[in-house]
């Protein structure tokens, strides 16, 4: 298993590739010029010159719906070579015009060298308050991860989080689904403008509330796969040799995929009868990742997601196998299937059965 890389977020609007519906036909236009010489007085016949230059008119799709890694729309670098979201979308348009234009194949040879610009109305972040490293380190900050039971969020920019999460009642509903963030008498929930952070595919935001008369500060971690960049009326301008200068508009949606790399999980050693160690469900229950009622085991999906760093999937126990060199170590294998509406970074949504970790028994 790969170890999940840490990414840092500075703020910005939050491309892969699937999709898409469209309605505009392929358009190819020709420009001709003809010059004639009817003679030069020495008896030579006239010559006709005819040159023709063909240019392709881009036919934009009315809806562009893509799935891919966060890196397709957000550059985690912080230096001067960092690319904006607009620049990343332009790069994808040039590399994959078929995802944006009904005549993408006809454009492939000319759009790579064309001038393409994108205007999504992206704005600078308003999360300019106290830095994440400061507010999150305070001793009384409660930490929790956005529940799989909560909905995906469509945003035009990162600033939308202050509105799309909803009013106090809506944010309370989100927090009440997270054991660590549920308050006994919670009121006055709101998203602050304190700094954000992106770490291990989680976007951390600061939520405050009151528990009775006590002020509460929370670190709400939202999996990036819960975020969709949705721009109604994305403007695309195209010009260049062999391509008709065009000002185009489309409705753009980018579904950030699930990164299938996992964190290294090393749970503490537990006691379990040797005869039960090959029962993956019993092992998970013993480790605290499942509950049992009678003979029915229920996996704690949110707890497994946090432990593995793999979010918005349904986990199922597959097997538990003894290590060939250590009788007290067993490899527990799980199957992970993206929830409805979610995809892996490669755009697929089939199950992966190679999710595993080592359990140690004493």
UniProtKB/Swiss-Prot annotation:
Q: What does this protein do?
A: Major M.penetrans antigen.
| Keywords assigned by UniProt, alphabetized | Cell membrane, Lipoprotein, Membrane, Palmitate, Signal
Which residue(s) hold a covalent lipid per the annotation (S-diacylglycerol cysteine)? 31
Q: Cellular component terms, GO, for this chain's entry?
A: plasma membrane
What is the protein's major site of localization?
membrane
The reply on keyword Transport is no
Q: Which family does it belong to?
A: Belongs to the p35 lipoprotein family.
Q: How is it modified after translation?
A: The N-terminus is blocked.
Region annotated Disordered, chain positions: 33-53
Say where the lipid (N-palmitoyl cysteine) is covalently attached: 31
Q: Which Pfam families match?
A: MpPF1
Also noted in the record is: The dominant B-epitopes are found at the N- and C-terminal regions.
Residues annotated as signal peptide? 1-30
Q: How does it sit in the membrane?
A: Lipid-anchor
Where found in the cell? Cell membrane
**PROSITE patterns referenced in this protein's UniProt entry, alphabetically:** PROKAR_LIPOPROTEIN
In its UniProt entry, what is this protein called? Lipoprotein p35
